[in-house]
């Protein structure tokens, strides 16, 4: 019998660096709304909730530089800096707020 457990993940020792070779942009974001806004790790930041005030043009094709499956919560009235990285792979964005629905390269 084997000691392996189906689906088990055995990580390497040490720290795993995320988005190591990606260009990082820091953007200041303010929540002008009266409710918290949460943005997930792979959400096209350009299309985030309109209550979030930031320079949208520079965030086109970018997502949060945080681990997959996590999110950042913006409380009403708060201002914070976030780090963004470019989408990789095919660089297609569908859904979200339907502002792109296609290639991020065009």
UniProtKB/Swiss-Prot annotation:
Alphabetized InterPro entries for the sequence: Urease_beta-like, Urease_betasu_sf, Urease_subunit
E.C. code: 3.5.1.5
Enzyme class: hydrolase
Pathway annotation from the record: Nitrogen metabolism; urea degradation; CO(2) and NH(3) from urea (urease route): step 1/1
GO BP terms, alphabetized: urea catabolic process
Record has Nucleotidyltransferase as a keyword: no
Subcellular localization(s) per the UniProt record: Cytoplasm
GO molecular function: urease activity
Domain of life from the UniProt record: Bacteria
Keywords assigned by UniProt, alphabetized: Cytoplasm, Hydrolase
Gene Ontology cellular component terms for the protein in this record: urease complex
Coarse class of the protein's main subcellular location: cytoplasm
Keyword Amino-acid biosynthesis part of the UniProt annotation: no
Family under the similarity heading: Belongs to the urease beta subunit family.
PANTHER family: UREASE
Protein's name in the database: Urease subunit beta
Protein's organism: Prochlorococcus marinus (strain AS9601)
Gene name of the encoded protein: ureB
